[in-house]
A protein has these predicted regions:
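Flexible coil/turn and secondary-structure edge motifs
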Residues: 1-180
Length: 180
């Protein structure tokens, strides 16, 4: 009997970075860049980038929990972005780039809150973890040109300078979890 697939929705800066990293992991079957967390229905990239929609750039990950656990997805998440920066990552600033875990179940909420508490207790960073943990109310896929962006545009400036180093870091730190 095949185990049901599960879904995780995470925001940690530009969705191109997260998408590129998660697409390389065993057990991850699909990654969709999109928007979540705001009241605006069917937001556009332009509206989200204006910072007025309330949405964050996120990725929605469909994964096989028999191959990769939600906890492992969170481990990657907290390694490839800075969860101590409020409303921004690197050159990207605004609430649309906030660090946020949108949970789909009470179990995911417990795991996410536990991971934040663990990192806070361990004092992994000098600054406190500001990652929000919130229920997913709605997810809106981003425009087609945002999907699989890094693979289709590896030479683009932002991809070379911002995305590629995060992918390289994940490849180094999560070698055992990479697709062959």
């Amino acid at each position: 009997m095949t185990q049901a697939r599960e879904t995780a929705t995470l925001g940690g800066g530009c969705f191109w970075c997260l998408e590129a990293v998660y697409l390389e992991l065993k057990g991850v079957e699909r990654v969709v860049s999109g928007y979540a967390g705001g009241p605006t229905r069917n937001p556009t990239y332009e509206l989200v980038c204006s910072g007025t929609s309330g949405h964050a750039e996120v990725v929605q990950i469909t994964y096989d929990p028999a191959v990769i656990s939600y906890r492992e997805l969170l481990d990657v998440f907290f390694t490839i972005h800075d969860p101590t920066t409020l409303n921004g990552q690197g050159p990207d600033h605004g609430s649309q780039y906030r660090s946020v875990v949108f949970y789909h179940s009470p179990e995911q909420k417990r795991e996410a809150e536990g991971k934040v508490a663990e990192l806070t207790a361990q004092r992994v960073w000098d600054d406190p973890v500001v990652t929000q943990v919130a229920p997913l109310e709605a997810f809106y896929p981003a425009e087609d040109y945002h999907q699989d962006y890094f693979r289709r545009n590896p030479g683009q400036g932002y991809c070379r300078v911002i995305v590629a180093p995060k992918v390289a870091k994940a490849r180094k730190l999560f070698l055992e979890q990479l697709r062959k």
